[in-house]
Amino acid sequence: MKDVVGSPGTWSGMSLRVSQCVFAGASVVAMASAYGFSNYTAFCYLIASMGLQLLWSFGLACLDIYSLQTKRDLHNPVLVSLFVVGDWVTAILSFAAASASAGVTILFERDVHFCRMYPQLSCGRYELSVILAFITWSFIATSAVSMFWLLASL
């Protein structure tokens, strides 16, 4: 069995999960605090996707902490298969939500100039939330690849 960076039950795995939680939570807070986000489906989808990512990552971070405290091995093929599927599903959902929200944000900023016409829209917060969502996705993608690599090595 290989020692893969970011595998469950390791410090690197826990740090990946905690980073996912922090950035997903920050993305949700930035978007939820923006005026008028609920009028646009892509932004609601971003909140739902980042909320799901937050819950998934928090659960796995807690599992990593438990594993580190009790020195249990989480490299069971069935358990790692569950992690692989969960990571890939949340990675795809998060990337789709971040991309859709980025498209709407660019449309507002550059194409139709909604941000100038309607200054009450929080376009800066929309942008911040999208940036945080893409950072979250980069951590999720790293985790998904390492889980897949670990599964292949079991």
Curated annotation (Swiss-Prot):
Glycans are attached at N39. Residues 1-17, 64-77, 151-154 are cytoplasmic. It is found in: Cell membrane. It is a multi-pass membrane protein. The keyword Disulfide bond does not apply. The keyword Nucleotide-binding does not apply. The chain crosses the membrane at residues 18-38, 43-63, 78-98, 130-150. Residues 39-42, 99-129 are extracellular. Its main location: membrane. GO terms for cellular component: membrane; plasma membrane. InterPro entries: CASP_dom (IPR006702), CASPL-5 (IPR045009). Keywords: Cell membrane, Glycoprotein, Membrane, Transmembrane, Transmembrane helix. Belongs to the Casparian strip membrane proteins (CASP) family. Homodimer and heterodimers. This is CASP-like protein 5B3. The lineage of its organism: Eukaryota, Viridiplantae, Streptophyta, Embryophyta, Tracheophyta.
